[in-house]
Each structure stands twice: as structure tokens, then as C-alpha cells.
Amino acid sequence: MTEADAPAPGTAPGSAPDASPPSPSSPPSPPYLFDVTGAGHREAAQELRARGPAVPVQLPGGVLGHAVTRHHALRDFLTHPEVAKDASHFAALREGRIPPGWPLTTFATVDGMTTADGADHRRLREPAVKALSPRRVAALRPRVERLTAELLDGLPALAARGGGTVDLRHAFAYPLPMRVISELIGVDEEFRDRLHQLSGLVVSTVIDPEAALAANRELVEVLGQVVAARRAAPGDDLTSALIAACDEADARLSERELIGTLLLMIAAGHQTTLDLITNAVRALCAHRDQLDLVREGRADWADVVEETLRHDSPVAHFPFRYPTRDLDVGGTVIPRGTPVLASYAAAGRDPEAYGPDADRFDVTRRPAVRRLSFGHGPHVCPGAPLARLEARIALRALFTRFPDLDLAVPEAELRPLPTFVGNSAAELPVRPGRDVGTAGQDGSATSPGAG
């Protein structure tokens, strides 16, 4: 099929877009076809939500699934007792109909808490919950503040070398959460950049099968090296604790589960925060009036973080859950064993939950419902408090020190990440502008606009 023959995003091959609602006698609409390049996230979310609370979708490789797209339907689906995370319920995978190198395989098959249910899920989740306890996260605040200040110290020189511009995603939004989670987990510096690159490849939806298989193999190899380094020199970190659980006589963790847990902690522990910070900076630069509200004390940095999570969720469509029986979701029956996406991007702008102006970025918004961007129920992200803390500290320090910071290109020209699972810009070129120095960078919660 040539590029000219390719279907428009949102339309299965051989069909044409149709914005009009079907009449009662109309045949079912074709499954929604995701744009694997990650382009048009906002338009995709709008169309998915308009089609209904549960929408048939076509995933890469022609695999059929569903997406749950509206806030209340998604909230209920995420806690439904007859919805599973264990891929043994994934009918097409179980029956051998998923080809090798399928780009979404890792989401279904990684051995960890995101693919387990019941007692197994609680067992695999426990180490992460302990490592990310409220007391542990609160104790990390000074370290996050110091790292933030160090990274901001380097921005003027980087911008000077770039003719006044710098890629804020690469220079600030990435290294901050990667350093924090690596220190918490026990990942030596030599492994961090490669783990970031590989975790990006395994969530890409444009990767070819051979490259996907190679990336997964290398990711397991590098994580094995991380484990070997900690076995040789244990420390007060999560990896050392996981190794101890794996090596004890009544091993509470298998070697595969150890690797899978590390993969999830490293990937989710930095990528979501990286995208959250990137999206928040993009939104504030595009909506300077909202930044002014924070500076005037009419909103705080926690409000910015929460509104970014709702309005521009770092995770757009998260794989997978599987009904264990045919399940009616808002009038649509999802067949047993179907892979289902949690469409946080669509649910975050649901007018039924957030009002008729749900598409508007408004840091003073006080919704009556809880945001779902970090999940809901037993599988809610255990790293959410740390991600929120990092983002609040990063945004406050960034815009305090560089009050004139702005995008170096029009927002519409920002290139998306090559995936429909995650949602962010692949680069964030900015002009930092004047540097007012380190005054007010102590992170005090009593200062104006503190988070």
C-alpha cells in the first residue's frame, strides 16, 4: 500500500472517515485505527471518546482490541472484578495469533506487577510500595531539589552553545527523574542512558519486529548486568532488596520477576515524569495566562501538575486488561479475552466528568472527580507520589529561575514521541532567557506558588 493509499488515522484500511453518527440500521463502524507514529493524540482522543465509552480498535499488526474512553466507564472498568491483567487471559496471544516482535508484546508478557492479579500482584507490588512509601518519598525531596538546581545551573551554558536555545527535554526533564529513580533502585550511571534508550524502543509502536526483538533481548541483558553489579556490591537500594528476596531459600521472587520488576520500575519511574514535566512546560509556554495565575498565587504548582495530568496525560492509551467474560461497558460488549486499552488521554477531557470546557487547560480547575492518569484501584501507579513531587519541584524551580523561558518553535511544530501509548514531545526546544540566579530555589513550601 502506498502512502497515498494509506487510510486516514482513525479509519481501518479500506474505509473512509465518517463524522456522522450511524443510523440504527447502519452497519457497525470499522475499528478505530491508531496512528502508530504518535501524531494527532488530541484528535484521536476526541474521536475515540465521541464513538462511545468502549470502542473497537485496531492495534499494530491488525490485532483487534477495545479502548475504554470515558471517565466514569474507565474508572469502573479499572476496578471491575471480572477484568484481569494476567496475559493468560489474552485470547489471541494464548492461541498463537500474535506474531513474534509485535511492538506491544512487552506490555502483555513482562513478568511483574502490571501483568499479575490477586495474590501474585500483591507479592510483586510489595517491594515497589515499600521503596516508594510516603516517608521514603518525603525524604527524597532534598535530593530532588539539589539535582534540580544542578541541572538548572547548566542550562545557560547549554543554551549559549545552541545559539540561545536548548532541548529542555534532554537537558532537564530526562536527567532529573532518571537520576532519582536510578539512585533509589541502584542503577549505576554507566547503564542509565542505554536503559532510557531501550525503554523508549520497547514502547515504540513504529518499531519493526526484528528491532523490537533485539531491543527486548538487549534490555534483559543490560538489566542482568545491573543485577550482577548489585550482587557483587549490595547497597541500600531496591535492586539489592529484590536480589535478597530472589536468593533466599523460600524465594519470594523468581529471576524473571526480578528482571521484570526492574524493567517496570526504571521505565515507568523516569519516563512518565519526563513526559509530565515536558508536557507541563509545553502547556505553560502555550498558555502564559495560566503561568501568570501561578505567579499571582491564584494557583500553585500542584495545580499545574494535576491539570497537566488531566489535560495532556503522559500515558495516552495504556495496554492491557482482559475481560474474563463477555463484558458490557456502556452498551458495548467487549468479548472475553480481548486486549483493552485504558485511554487516559480521552477520559481526561471527558465533558461528563470535567465540564463543557474540558478541552481547556485551566490550572484553577476544581473537578469533582479524581483524575485517572496514574490509574485507579489495585493497579494504581505506586510511583505517582514521587512523580508529582519531582514535577512540582522541577516546574517551580525552572520558571522561578528562568521567568522568561519560552518555546523556541511553535507548539504545532513539536515532534511527537513515536508511540500512541505515551504522549509527549520528542524534543522541547526552548529559549531560557534571563537567569535570575538561585534566589528562591530552596523549595520552601511557604514561598508563593510552591507545590
Located regions from the model:
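Cytochrome P450
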Residues: 1-451
